[in-house]
C-alpha cells in the first residue's frame, strides 16, 4: 500500500504536480533565455559550503516535499549541501523562497564515477524538513515507467549553468528549448556512438542550445498531452569539445528507467 501511494504521488497521473501557477513563457528564441519567475517551481539550486560561503554547483527537481532528484555526479561525500527552492535569482533573497539542509544523499548503487557512459547518473537527496507547497514551490512529476519520447519531441532544460563554454554563470534561472534525439540517431557513430545507452536521453545537438556546466542534475522538462510538465531527464553530461557542439546533444539520465528505484529509496528512507 505504501509503495502504491508513493507511485501515485510521484508519477504524472494526478494534476497535483507539473502544473505551475505561473506557466512558463515558451518563446521561439534560439538559445537560452531568462525563465519567467516561478514558472519551473520544482527547480532547485543545489549548493555546497566552501570557505564560509554557499556556492551553486548543480540543479535538481523537487519530487516530494522532502526529496530532491539530481545527478549522482553532483554529490561528494566530503561536502555539506543545502537546496534553495522557489528562487529565480541566486543573488537575491526572494519572497517565498526557502533554503533547506540536505540530511541524506542516496546515490544509485550502480553509479561509477569512472564510467560515466554506463549511466545510472541519478541520486536522491532527503531534506532535513518538508517544504510547504505554494504558488512558487511545487512538485515535479515523473513520467510513467518505460516512457520513451519520440524523435524531435520538444522539451526544455532549465538551470543556472554557464551560458556558453567557459562563459559566465547566470544569476537568473535560464530555460532552453531542446528537441529529443532518438536513440537510433544519437547512438550513430557521427553523433555519440556507443557512449549513449538506452537508460539515457539525448536532446539538442543543433550547435546552438544545450545544457552546460552548472546545469548538471537539473531537469529536462517535457509537456504531456494533458499539459502537465514531466521531468523526463536529469542533466548528466555533454561533449568535452564544449557546450552547444553540433551533433553532440546534451545527455540526460532517462528518469522513466528508474521509477522503481526512486520509489524504493523514498519508501526505505
Swiss-Prot record:
Question: Which one Pfam family would you cite for this protein?
Answer: Trypsin
For the Peptidase S1 domain, which residue ranges apply?
29-267
Superkingdom assignment: Eukaryota
Protein family per UniProt? Belongs to the peptidase S1 family. Elastase subfamily.
Gene name tied to this protein: CELA2A
Question: Protein name, please?
Answer: Chymotrypsin-like elastase family member 2A
Q: Which residues form the propeptide?
A: 17-28
Against InterPro entries, the record matches this protein to:
Peptidase_S1_Elastase_sf, Peptidase_S1_PA, Peptidase_S1_PA_chymotrypsin, Peptidase_S1A, Trypsin_dom, TRYPSIN_HIS, TRYPSIN_SER
The answer to whether UniProt assigns keyword Nucleotidyltransferase to this entry is no
- Free-text tissue specificity from the UniProt record: Pancreas.
Q: What is its EC number?
A: 3.4.21.71
Q: Which GO terms describe its cellular component?
A: extracellular region; extracellular space
Major location (coarse): secreted
Q: Which organism is it from?
A: Bos taurus
**Native organism taxonomy:** Eukaryota, Metazoa, Chordata, Craniata, Vertebrata
What range does the record give for the signal peptide?
A: 1-16
Amino acid at each position: 500500500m505504501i509503495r502504491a501511494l508513493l507511485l501515485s504521488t510521484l508519477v504524472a497521473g494526478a494534476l497535483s504536480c507539473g502544473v505551475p501557477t505561473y506557466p512558463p513563457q515558451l518563446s521561439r528564441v534560439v538559445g537560452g533565455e531568462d525563465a519567467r519567475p516561478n514558472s519551473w517551481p520544482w527547480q532547485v539550486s543545489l549548493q555546497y559550503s566552501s570557505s564560509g560561503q554557499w556556492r551553486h554547483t548543480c540543479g535538481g527537481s523537487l519530487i516530494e516535499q522532502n526529496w530532491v532528484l539530481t545527478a549522482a555526479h553532483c554529490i561528494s561525500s566530503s561536502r555539506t549541501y543545502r537546496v534553495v527552492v522557489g528562487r529565480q535569482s541566486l543573488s537575491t533573497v526572494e519572497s517565498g523562497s526557502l533554503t533547506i539542509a540536505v540530511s541524506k544523499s542516496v546515490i544509485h548503487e550502480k553509479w561509477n564515477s569512472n564510467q560515466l557512459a554506463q549511466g545510472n547518473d541519478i541520486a536522491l537527496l532527503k531534506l532535513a524538513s518538508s517544504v510547504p507547497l505554494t504558488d512558487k514551490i511545487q512538485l515535479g512529476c515523473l513520467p510513467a515507467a518505460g516512457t520513451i519520447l519520440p524523435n524531435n519531441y520538444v522539451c526544455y532544460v532549465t538551470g543556472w549553468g554557464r551560458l556558453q563554454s567557459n562563459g559566465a554563470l547566470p544569476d537568473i534561472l535560464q530555460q532552453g528549448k531542446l528537441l529529443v534525439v532518438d536513440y537510433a540517431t544519437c547512438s550513430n557513430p557521427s553523433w555519440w556512438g556507443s557512449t549513449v545507452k538506452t537508460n539515457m536521453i539525448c536532446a539538442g545537438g543543433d550547435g546552438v542550445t544545450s545544457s552546460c556546466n552548472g546545469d548538471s542534475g537539473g531537469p529536462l522538462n517535457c509537456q504531456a498531452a494533458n499539459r502537465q510538465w514531466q521531468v523526463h531527464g536529469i542533466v548528466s553530461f555533454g561533449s568535452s569539445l564544449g557546450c552547444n557542439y553540433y551533433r553532440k546533444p546534451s545527455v540526460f539520465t532517462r528518469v522513466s528507467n528508474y521509477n522503481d528505484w526512486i520509489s524504493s529509496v523514498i519508501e526505505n528512507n
